[in-house]
């Protein structure tokens, strides 16, 4: 069985970039993961594939039959701090990210032929986070040491922080009323 724990996740910039996200394979089969990621018409990812758009969220392809409903993908909500990674939540169709969004519900439209991997043309709804923001998060992953910020990254991170504050405030108000 494929063992996935907090040590399975590392500095996002040490993974392999593919367009605007990063991939790895915890079983060492990176060439097959890259072949799937780069297949123009879509492909099924091999077991052990790890996909991350931002340091705090990941999806890992499990063994065939592990979770047929999710295409055998397990979703992870991560906490990253310095060199440490902790798993905040993990699972299949039931996992929500820290903003209350259901991971699988977002990825479900990309079922075929994209193996549940969202990109602009894969049928998934757009997320309220710009490419500049995800890039800034990737370049500032605290597990990687010094941030490699580019022009505009500080502003993008500020705007993202404001979105997070608004989202958590709305959620808190919703719980009260």
Predicted segments, located by residue:
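N-terminal secretory signal peptides
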Residues: 1-47
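Sequence context surrounding c-type heme c attachment/ligation sites in exported
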Residues: 42-177
